[in-house]
UniProtKB/Swiss-Prot annotation:
PTM description: Phosphorylated by RsbT. Dephosphorylated by RsbX.
Entry keyword annotation includes Mitochondrion: no
Keyword Coiled coil: no
Keywords for the protein's UniProt record, in alphabetical order: Phosphoprotein
Cited function: Negative regulator of sigma-B activity. Non-phosphorylated RsbS binds to RsbT, preventing its association with RsbU. Requires any one of RsbRA, RsbRB, RsbRC or RsbRD to sequester RsbT. When RsbS and the RsbR paralog(s) are phosphorylated, they release RsbT, which can then bind and activate RsbU.
Residue ranges constituting the STAS domain according to the UniProt record: 4-115
PTM annotation (Phosphoserine): residues: 59
Protein name as annotated: RsbT antagonist protein RsbS
The organism's taxonomic lineage, starting at the top: Bacteria, Bacillati, Bacillota, Bacilli, Bacillales
Gene: rsbS
InterPro entries tied to this protein: Bact_StressResp_Reg, STAS_dom, STAS_dom_sf
Self-association state and partner proteins as the record states: Interacts with RsbRA, RsbRB in the stressosome. The stressosome probably also contains RsbRC and RsbRD.
Amino acid sequence: MRHPKIPILKLYNCLLVSIQWELDDQTALTFQEDLLNKIYETGANGVVIDLTSVDMIDSFIAKVLGDVITMSKLMGAKVVLTGIQPAVAVTLIELGIALEEIETALDLEQGLETLKRELGE
């Protein structure tokens, strides 16, 4: 079965990701690899990940998302999560995904503003 790729768009020195469907394990792992490669290739120093269309995540997807955030930070890219639905927020907290140092915003527009502020632009 072919898994859909999540589009990663470059805007100035940032990457924009809008996840438009529920993730399965393979798609999440492919996204992790694709995003890290894109950060490396473009030298992006910021990433906005929009989860508005994601209503629910399981423990594996939550772990992959946490890993993506940590790995992006290790590569020098600040991450802002946007559009977190209530059930997703509950799952992330219940699973102990550390979000204390992660910037969040209600929507993509606020996420971009938050990222610009974080990057001092």
